[in-house]
Curated annotation (Swiss-Prot):
GO terms for cellular component: host cell membrane; membrane; virion component. It comes from Pseudomonas phage Pf3 (Bacteriophage Pf3). This is Head virion protein G6P. The gene is VI. Belongs to the inovirus G6P protein family. The chain crosses the membrane at residues 25-45, 56-76. GO terms for biological process: symbiont entry into host cell.
């Protein structure tokens, strides 16, 4: 009985560890890919904003636009990583 219990626990743990490493790998891969995409978008946006007059840039800075862009980019990356991990595990269909 103890041997059977040890086999069942060993199988469950090995399956869990394998799935955990798989999900972490998919999450990291997705995060790295999307980070490059969002950084590329923000790098394209930056030259467009630097061509604006200084008083408009000051108003945008006071309004918190640079921080808002950073927050939105981070939220997109976080949500995409979570969704890809869930889809790979099978939680999302």
């Amino acid at each position: 009985m103890a041997r059977l219990l040890a086999l069942v626990i060993g199988y469950a743990l090995s399956s869990f560890v394998l799935k955990l490493f798989t999900v972490l790998g998919v999450g990291i891969f997705t995060y790295v890919g999307l980070t490059a995409l969002v950084d590329g978008f923000l790098n394209l946006l930056q030259p467009m904003l630097t061509g604006l007059p200084s008083y408009i840039l000051d108003i945008l800075a006071i309004a918190g636009v640079p921080e808002a862009l950073s927050i939105v980019g981070s939220a997109l990356l976080t949500r995409a990583s979570i969704n890809s991990a869930k889809a790979f595990v099978g939680v999302l269909t």
